[in-house]
Amino acid sequence: MSETQKENPYSSTVLLPKTDFPMKADLAKREPEQIRSWKQNRIFRKMREQRSGKKEFVLHDGPPYANGNFHLGHALNKILKDTIIKSKSLAGFYADMIPGWDCHGLPIEVQVLKNLGKKVRETGPEELRQLCRKYAEEFVGKQGDDLSRFLCFWDEGRIYKTMSPDFEAKIVEVFGELFKKGYVYRGKKPVYWSIDLATAHAEAEIEYYPHISPSIYVKFPIIGEKKRFCLIWTTTPWTLPANLAICFNRKIEYSIFKTESSEELILADALAENVTITTGVALTKLKPITSEELAALKFQHPFVDRISVSLFGDHVTLEAGTGCVHTAPGHGQDDYKVGLAAGLEPFSPVDDYGRYTDEFPLMQGKKVFDANPEIIQLLRDKGLLLYHGELEHSYPHSWRSKKPLIFRATPQWFFKIDFQDLREKSLSAIDGVRWIPSWGITRIRSMVETRPDWCLSRQRNWGVPIPAFTCESCGQTHIDDASIQFFTKMVREKGIEIWYSEETKDLLPPKTKCGKCGNDSFKKGNDILDVWFDSGVSNFSVLGERKDEPPADLYLEGSDQHRGWFQSSLWPSMALRGIPPYKAVLTHGYVLDEKGRAMSKSLGNGIDPTADIIQVYGADILRLWVSSLDFRDDIKVGKESLKIVSEQYRKIRNTFRYLLGNLDGHTPEQNLPFEELEELDRFYLSKLAGFVEDAVASYETYQFHQIYQKLILFCTVTLSQDYFDMIRDRMYCDLRDSKSRRSSSTALQYILDSLCILVAPILSFTAEEVWTSNGKKDSVFLQTFPDLKSWKNQSLEDKFESALQAREVVQKALEIARQEGKLGKSLEAALEIVSKSGLSFGELLPKETLELLFVVSQIHEENPGMEVLSSHENEKFSVKVLKPLQGECPRCWRHTEDISKEGDLCGRCKSVVA
């Protein structure tokens, strides 16, 4: 016999919780085994098969670059998507998401070139493409492993890669459809250009950083006037060799001003004072000059033997400068537009690597940024530099090289944004999309309203070639529907390598001739498609078509994708379908360190989701952290926040452990019908029903942080602090098969099952672990959210809540007695409770229920002559803690009125042990 049994011979008769479910989760070690089980049993496929024919919910996965391991931002994104898919499936939907990877483009090509090091010169284009494909394939595998380790569900044989032949063929096909409909054209326009990478950049590939530029005021001599000049201001001296005009605004008032050196300068009246303050040159107004007079002016280029003309444009403002704008149509969007209207061809004497060409022989071969000081000195030597300073401003940089970009006019392929009112149609369609958070619509509208034509072409090796040919006889570009369809079929069979491996004649339909001269000899183009076009047409390649509605129910990405993937997906879909590709768009913020700084290698503040979280805490802790966030805003994370989440997880796990322990020996077949349950149990099942309803609603609106908060409250307060405490005596000391104990066991079973299913989208491993620990054979993910609305009983809740209002007063009174050393356990107390409203507690709940509610041995509305140990009251209740006249039952520790002498069992315990 144990020491405990010697001390208390009844301990073996008490039904204490018993379970093999460990308190220590050991998630990092045990989760991989569960991942293997899910894969072997094809749980994700079974989830979909089980929901076949149900209402469909499709989340389209924006493809990450197959470049490097997943960082914490990726983990946030993928876990959010997985949580949504699981919650939608449990809500009864046929929920689906096919994970994808972006495999072409600069990020991969640049990394491969970097890895080659000195061998780069020995590597030809064909070998480079093979290395890029191999590199992308490697990281698809690594990131796929990361995805599984985040406990995300996906079928490994059911993914999309933008470098697969089928996908590449779809890219070419969609490009062809857009070309056929007139949305694609070739033209020479200024585009963002990386002189480090020698390629064009789209709007989505640009990042803005602080940059210091020269700030100069330059005098353009007026033809026919000896001492009269037009004053311009620029921060890009290197573009002056390409100047073809000076632009004014007809709505701005201009005048001729005289300097102390008797020179005359034309500039805007409203900016004269600013010019004087900046340059230190005093200006005296001589006379106004009209728009007609300005239009007649011609200007001598400051250092090139060329005449510049006068133009007018609304882009000229009074925000800075002189109101007279240096205009180089080959190096600026606005410059290009006004130049085009005036018949000026864009002129850009700069090559792919940012060096001046022989069109500016004075500095041929010089890099443009390096030329700035020389151009400034040239102006100074000619007496045409009024002022030279510096300006720090936000300047466009390449997202890949982090180096400044230039605007440069080159022949490129473009998507025509304003063709057939596409911009207006898209703006109208945006209004019909659900944007979460709501400010997303304002952000994307502002971008769509001002977006220039999309530059589709790139001058790189790794990507889908634009199927355009050049006639070797007359130089005409050849591209038509027949040639695109022919090439699409070839790509579908053999991949894009066919473009490089086959002879040009074999890439075109037989008997293809030049539409201009009739020649049949062509050469291939060298441009590839923007990688944003690849991902932008993924909804055509991956998703099934739906009649008159978008193919995706939801897009979910970081808020930076308003200018990226959300737009690159929108334009082709609007052009070809007439509708957006998505019904709703949900965005999340950036992951920052605990000080609100971006994570970077230089700061050393990065948190690796695998090494720093999963291998330390487990993936369920990572998922719980994600669920705790209001992710619509930027998110701060550090060791302290992860520690807090880990502690909250322990409380949730402890709740599950207590439930499982108390259900030892209980089977669902022993559950009582709901209507036969005790009132206390029905009250807490009503509370459960309310919690479930709220949680399901929060899943529906993607407000997972609300579920997290309510789950913690439900587990720690509603259950652990209240309900478990109230039924402990019943569960431990009642007869195992008594109706009272079965009532509570039934409630605990319902609570366990409901909580388990409810948290499964978030705590995927733990939910499955609890589910199987309770003897369930199938997966928790093959269930549906419980519908407990019929259990919701407001009148019952009102009745209990009235009684529970006294619990705070009771607990305070008990605490006073403990502090004074008069009381140990609450079961050593009896209570006198008086409602100041005159309401009798007996009218609300039976005395036995109140004793459970307050976890005391006896309840009295009037003291039957017991010693008062303490008292407390508020405006509603007065409570006295009494010392029971009876002794303590050695089995249940209660002091009940049926105990006749010290050491006797109470009547209930006598019947149990008999």
From Swiss-Prot:
**Record: residues binding L-isoleucyl-5'-AMP:** E557
EC annotation? 6.1.1.5
Report the GO molecular function annotations: aminoacyl-tRNA deacylase activity; ATP binding; isoleucine-tRNA ligase activity; tRNA binding; zinc ion binding
**Gene3D superfamilies given in the database record:** 1.10.730.20, HUPs (3.40.50.620), Ile-tRNA synthetase CP2 domain-like (1.10.10.830), Valyl/Leucyl/Isoleucyl-tRNA synthetase, editing domain (3.90.740.10)
- Fetch the SUPFAM superfamilies from UniProt: Anticodon-binding domain of a subclass of class I aminoacyl-tRNA synthetases, Nucleotidylyl transferase, ValRS/IleRS/LeuRS editing domain
Give start-end ranges for motif 'HIGH' region. Answer: 64-74
Short sequence motif named 'KMSKS' region, residue ranges: 598-602
| Keywords in alphabetical order | Aminoacyl-tRNA synthetase, ATP-binding, Cytoplasm, Ligase, Metal-binding, Nucleotide-binding, Protein biosynthesis, Zinc
Where found? Cytoplasm
- Which reactions are catalysed by this chain? tRNA(Ile) + L-isoleucine + ATP = L-isoleucyl-tRNA(Ile) + AMP + diphosphate
Q: Name the GO cellular-component terms.
A: cytosol
* UniProt: Zn(2+) binding residues: C889, C892, C906, C909
> What HAMAP family has UniProt attached to this entry?
Ile_tRNA_synth_type1
**PANTHER family from the entry?**
ISOLEUCINE--TRNA LIGASE, MITOCHONDRIAL, SOLEUCYL-TRNA SYNTHETASE
Q: What role does it play?
A: Catalyzes the attachment of isoleucine to tRNA(Ile). As IleRS can inadvertently accommodate and process structurally similar amino acids such as valine, to avoid such errors it has two additional distinct tRNA(Ile)-dependent editing activities. One activity is designated as 'pretransfer' editing and involves the hydrolysis of activated Val-AMP. The other activity is designated 'posttransfer' editing and involves deacylation of mischarged Val-tRNA(Ile).
Write down what this protein is called.
Answer: Isoleucine--tRNA ligase
Please give the organism: Leptospira borgpetersenii serovar Hardjo-bovis (strain JB197)
Query: Highest lineage ranks of the organism?
Result: Bacteria, Pseudomonadati, Spirochaetota, Spirochaetia, Leptospirales
